[in-house]
Amino acid sequence: MKFYTNVEVWGGKILYRGVEEGRRVRHRVDYHPSLFIPSKTPTKYTTIHGEYVGKVSPGNIRDARDFVKQYEDVDNFKVYGNTRYQYCFIADEFPGTVDWDITQIKIANIDIEVGEPDGGGFPEPDLSLIHI
């Protein structure tokens, strides 16, 4: 059994935490995402508008970011694909339904109580202006 508990992009790598064969694992993965570019010949990939696109792999995550940036201002040339590479990694590594085992996942909840800001209501959590 294999499932993920957290996947993040850090720099040009995927930081992966999960459970494999009942053991917790952590890995730095040199992931190579796929992107898609317009194709004049029919392929098995199309855009949501029915236009054919071809699959390309520019390299690792940094290379993929550079590829997207290189073509972002080029007229009549679009680069398609998900640039949230952690989700691409999950889709590639865990296709279909993930077989989760809740007994293997550590779950915690932290709830703090804070005072009320002047004028009532709820404080802005990003500002941390109210005492705990």
What are these regions (language model features)?
Residues 1-130:
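The two-metal-ion catalytic cores of nucleic-acid processing enzymes
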